[in-house]
């Protein structure tokens, strides 16, 4: 519903009233460059087509997501999360020293919490870096 003070679709629309010349211009005129920036409701998006008519992959079926990652600590029960093992902990850090998220590392929730705690312990003991120095 159009507000009377803002000039709705019948008045020229847009932001700032019927003759403001601000953003908008109601579906056709005024505003920045004519076409209207957030003006009236009709016509501006008609040439886009429906979502299902936009093209893209026509094959259907499965997308190529690849293999599901398995938590390395659950798969190999002999592996333990150890903050003193710098090589193992560096695997879960980016080049900038940030902890790699679970969806990328493939850890389960339990072991991701353990890894994060171990990395934070290693940082406190100066085994692992908080950040990498800028050049």
Curated annotation (Swiss-Prot):
One of the record's GO molecular function terms: structural constituent of ribosome
Bias-annotated ranges (Basic and acidic residues): 42-61
RNA-binding in keyword set: yes
Highest taxon in the source lineage: Bacteria
Keyword Hydrolase: no
Any one biological process term the GO annotation gives: translation
Gene Ontology CC entries for this record: cytosolic small ribosomal subunit
Pfam families to which the protein is assigned, alphabetical: Ribosomal_S18
Span list, region Disordered: 1-65
Keywords of the record: Ribonucleoprotein, Ribosomal protein, RNA-binding, rRNA-binding
Ranges of biased composition (kind: Gly residues): 9-41
PANTHER family: 30S RIBOSOMAL PROTEIN S18, SMALL RIBOSOMAL SUBUNIT PROTEIN BS18M
Function comment: Binds as a heterodimer with protein bS6 to the central domain of the 16S rRNA, where it helps stabilize the platform of the 30S subunit.
Subunit: Part of the 30S ribosomal subunit. Forms a tight heterodimer with protein bS6.
Family from the record: Belongs to the bacterial ribosomal protein bS18 family.
Protein name: Small ribosomal subunit protein bS18
């Amino acid at each position: 519903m159009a507000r009377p003070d803002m000039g709705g679709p019948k008045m020229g629309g847009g932001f700032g009233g019927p003759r403001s010349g601000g953003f908008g211009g109601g579906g056709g005129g005024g505003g920045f460059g004519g076409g209207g920036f957030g003006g009236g409701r009709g016509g501006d998006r008609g040439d886009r087509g429906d979502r299902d008519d936009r093209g893209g992959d026509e094959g259907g079926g499965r997308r190529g997501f690849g293999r599901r990652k398995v938590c390395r600590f659950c798969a190999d029960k002999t592996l333990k999360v150890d903050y003193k093992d710098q090589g193992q902990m560096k695997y879960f850090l980016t080049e900038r020293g940030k902890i790699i998220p679970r969806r990328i590392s493939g850890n389960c929730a339990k072991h991701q919490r353990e890894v994060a705690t171990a990395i934070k312990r290693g940082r406190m003991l100066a085994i692992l870096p908080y950040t990498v120095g800028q050049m």
